[in-house]
Amino acid sequence: MTFSADDINQTLDASGLRCPEPVMMVRKTVRLMQEGETLLVIADDPATVRDIPSFCRFMDHTLLASDTEQPPYRYLIRKGLN
């Protein structure tokens, strides 16, 4: 799956990090973003396949797209109202 550069406001490369670090970095990055902005997350920890979608649901952000067929995994998140 490809993501258009026009769809991405920020990119976070969490490659090489293991749970819980990728989600902690996503949380920190999203907190500094404006509502509606998008974040492309790149990670290679298999736990992110479960953790990133759960984080989005719990924090009311939108997981616009994901590519989890093989590492590196990619997730496109739109910041919600939090």
UniProtKB/Swiss-Prot annotation:
Cellular location(s): Cytoplasm
Keyword Cell division included in the entry's annotation: no
BP term (GO), one: tRNA wobble position uridine thiolation
Entry's Gene Ontology cellular component terms: cytoplasm
Recorded GO MF terms: sulfur carrier activity
Keyword Transport: no
Pfam families cross-referenced by the UniProt entry: TusA
Transmembrane segments: none
Active-site residues, Swiss-Prot/TrEMBL: C19 (cysteine persulfide intermediate)
Main location: cytoplasm
Keywords for the protein's UniProt record, in alphabetical order: Cytoplasm
Matches recorded under NCBIfam families: PRK00299.1 (NF001423)
Its biological purpose: Sulfur carrier protein which probably makes part of a sulfur-relay system.
HAMAP family, per database record: Thiourid_synth_A (MF_00413)
PANTHER family: SULFUR CARRIER PROTEIN TUSA, SULFUR CARRIER PROTEIN YEDF-RELATED
Family: Belongs to the sulfur carrier protein TusA family.
Protein name: Sulfur carrier protein TusA
Organism per entry: Tolumonas auensis (strain DSM 9187 / NBRC 110442 / TA 4)
